[in-house]
Amino acid sequence: ILDQGPLFETGGSTSHAPGGVFQTNPSRMMCKFAQYTVDLLRSLSFEEKPCFHTVGGIEVSKTKERHEDLYRKLGIAHSYGLTDAKIISPDEVLKMSPFIDPEKIHGGYYVPTDGLAAPVRAVRAMAKYVTDLNAGEFIGETPVTGFKISNNQIRGVETPHGDYEADIVLVSTGIWAPKMGRLANISLPLVPCEHQMAWLEPFEELKEFQADHKEAQVEHALMRHQDYSLYFR
């Protein structure tokens, strides 16, 4: 496995991804993928630390229309295997997220098994599993600069540090996938999009949070507010 950055905090999204996992999705396949991801990450640990924190996920409704939509999502969740999903009252939301004003919401859609992944820790755990089995090698600081192709068949990849022979190449480069595609004369229809991230001052409601204790930041449920395209962790 080749990576253009240092292992395992590569400088890409793995090292600074929020890590929130909301499993409900109108696509059955995506919903099942999310459930599999949660099950996998919950089974992993690295240096005796978990790779997933099952803190639950809540989507709040500020309008009657949004609240009705939460019931639609509840039906989807139950039909796709998230049988523990439920609609909760504003006061129940407040118990899980102390910075919420219960007077301003109709309620929430709650999935207890949603949670927060520790992306770098999870990658380290999976890499250790592979290397312990001598099933693979991880090489950092090695960007792919080209593909060796003969008779429309992949033969290997080129890097600044030498070539690697391979009859199958799996491209898992995220936003850099179109660049990789161009190296192989293949069009990959993927467009990276920016979005905003805000760092907030401490909340009085969260004053017991200790900034020097990283695990403390995952004590409260993940929060999503779809009317404003926001989520909080």
Where are these regions (language model features)?
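Short beta-to-alpha linker loops that shape the active-site pocket of alpha/beta-hydrolase fold enzymes
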Residues: 5-7, 93, 126
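Short, flexible, mixed-charge acidic loops at enzyme active sites
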Residues: 11-18, 99-101
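Dinucleotide-binding Rossmann-like beta1-alpha1 core, especially the glycine-rich loop
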Residues: 18-96, 229-232
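A short, glycine/Asx- and small/polar-enriched loop/turn
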Residues: 65, 99-105, 148-155
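General beta-strand structural signal in soluble alpha/beta enzymes
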Residues: 86-89, 138-140, 171
